[in-house]
Amino acid sequence: MFQHGVVYDYLNTKGKILKTYFHLPILIQRILWRKGIKSSITDNISFKENVWLEPGRMYTDENGNYHSMYGAKLLQTLNENCSTLSLNKNPELESDYSIDQFGFPSAPLDDIEISVLSDLNRVVKSMKNGGFYSKQEQAYILSALHIFFHSFRKYYSILKDKSVKRLFFVAHYHNEGIIAACKKLKIECIELQHGLINKKDLYYVYDAVFKNALRNALMPDKIMLYGPYWKSVLDYGFEWVDGTKVIGGNYLAHEFKSPNLSKKENLILVASQKGMDDKFIPYIQSLKTTLKGHPDWKIIVKLHPLEKKIDRYQVLRDSQCEIAPLHSSIFHFLERCKIQLSIYSTTFFDAAGYNVVNFSWVTNGIGSDYASSLSEDGIVIPVRPGDDIVSIYQGLAVSQSEFLSVEKIYSKYDPQTFMQP
């Protein structure tokens, strides 16, 4: 939570500063945390032994059917012994329950909740007396701690006195409240890798200096990984102990097939990233300018499936630039394109086996370390906005596409790893 607060302060994200209760006596805090919201479902619901927290990321197959990007194979493997709790309103994806159906508990805090709240207050007191953080940093950190306890109390009340043994979810960061609830209830929590993990990742690869502190960190009991490459990345850090890094293989909805490389076109695939329209739109506009010298080349922009500012990208549309449908398959375009362009993205790894050359726009600020690490590993070729990428591509002496085998990135799906306690 301290890391969240410091990052928000660095980004100056004003909307992340909340009104908190930590300045009040703890007895008053306990009363305020009883301000509940009535649930729209009864309290006597039953969960299966396994629970999947569906984040709402969808994949569209060739027939236009929607599938859970991360949960489709998991649910098929666990079959009737798994309940789905949806975290997003996606009518296309079936679920047993939606998080919106559960209100906020109005019952008095029990002994475990009081203990957690007391621990948080001790942490807050230590932070304020330590003199290490600025007033604004403290405001962000207090907000992060408030959100943590809100999440903890909600999921603790949802999962308490149920028969749940294992909970599957994506992204441990910003979900520490869920992890804490599972720890208190002795529920095994298992993270599914949901995208790019980088050696410079702020949440996945911590330096040795943090080793002692990480012993008390709220981390999942296991993380399921796509393949051995990702395990080797986590091995650089010190938060994942032996036995917690499990190679589950390609549990994504998409099945990898041998691409038809005869379909290759003079096409540049731009894979955007969520919430980065302020960078991608001008970068793509500069790319379009360079293509005036290459009229036989075209651009297709594949937006992140969770992109909210879709309309902003429409200004790019013309005869040389297409915007792909939001939930279309990235692999359909990798089969056709010769060049992929982004900043830092999992799609660079998806390009393995597709005879695609990856280029990464060099930027400043958050994310620059990620991109430089990909360049150091030979996964991307760094370029600047405005560079003539087609000419650079045409001047390459050797194909850069086979940086890693598909098997190292996405191993064969192993259902047994998801069934073992």
Name these PLM-found stretches.
Residues 1-421:
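Catalytic-core helical/loop segments in enzymes performing group transfer/polymerization on anionic/lipid-linked
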